[in-house]
């Protein structure tokens, strides 16, 4: 079942016997997720006596040459580089309110999103991004990764794909950045096959976003 601002929007059912289930849910009204306006549908899923509540946002993202399009409209990404650092908790936020405050502060300074830099952010942070209409790029903390070595892919790929699987349903997340500042090091050339393998795996796991 789907609803928007308390009003029923549609319902559907499908036979489920375990494993992956696909369901088509027609909606009576379309309310798109936009910058500064995180329009979200409330969802209720029922299986037997079990019930789960969640939410979803509708939007599209794609590249058109050098332009980034959100819902088919060109958007300039005025984003801040957010390292998720807190003086008292280092990379752990002291409270849920602190996560939300960071977004409000960024928006008050004129930014419309963030590159989540060198850290896998808390899911609650992404929830607030969804709710507030604040776009973000997901990134993997790859410091210390030696991309001149072919076996580097075995270090980064499993954990990176876990992040993609965990977060890909967030409408606020508009792109993936699996590497930060890759280049040759210590007079050794980076292995482009490492970057290519991670890129292709990312696009296979989530073909809906730029990477």
Where in the sequence are the language-model features?
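Short, acidic/turn-prone active-site loops that include or flank metal/cofactor-
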Residues: 140-146
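Secreted/periplasmic carbohydrate-active enzymes, especially glycoside hydrolases
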Residues: 1-118, 122-123, 128, 132-133, ...
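Hydrophobic residues in well-ordered beta-strands that form the structural core
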Residues: 136-138
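An active-site-proximal structural segment forming one wall of the substrate-binding cleft
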Residues: 153-170, 201, 205
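Active-site cleft segment of glycoside hydrolase catalytic domains centered on the general acid/base Glu
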Residues: 146-153, 179-206
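Active-site groove signature of glycoside hydrolases
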Residues: 160-189
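Active-site metal-binding loops of divalent metal-dependent hydrolases
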Residues: 119, 140, 180-182
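Short amphipathic alpha-helical interaction patches enriched in hydrophobic/aromatic residues
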Residues: 29-31, 144, 184
């Amino acid at each position: 079942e789907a609803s928007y601002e308390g009003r029923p929007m549609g319902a559907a059912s499908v036979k489920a016997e375990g494993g992956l289930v696909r369901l088509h849910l027609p909606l009576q009204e379309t309310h798109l997720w936009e910058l500064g306006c995180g329009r979200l549908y409330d969802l209720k899923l029922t299986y037997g006596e079990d019930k789960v509540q969640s939410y979803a946002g509708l939007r599209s993202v794609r590249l058109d040459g050098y332009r980034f399009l959100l819902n088919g409209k060109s958007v300039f990404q005025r984003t801040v580089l957010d390292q998720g650092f807190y003086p008292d908790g280092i990379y752990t936020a002291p409270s849920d309110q602190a996560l939300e405050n960071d977004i409000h502060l960024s928006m008050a300074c004129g930014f419309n999103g963030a590159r989540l830099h060198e850290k896998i952010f808390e899911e609650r942070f992404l929830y607030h991004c969804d709710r507030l209409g604040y776009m973000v790029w997901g990134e993997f903390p790859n410091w210390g990764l030696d991309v001149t070595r072919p076996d580097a892919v075995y270090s980064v790929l499993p954990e990176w794909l876990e992040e993609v699987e965990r977060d890909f349903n967030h409408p606020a997340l508009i792109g993936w950045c699996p590497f930060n500042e890759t280049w040759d090091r210590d007079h050794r050339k980076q292995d482009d096959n490492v970057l290519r393998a991670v890129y292709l795996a990312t696009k296979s796991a989530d073909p809906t976003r730029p990477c």
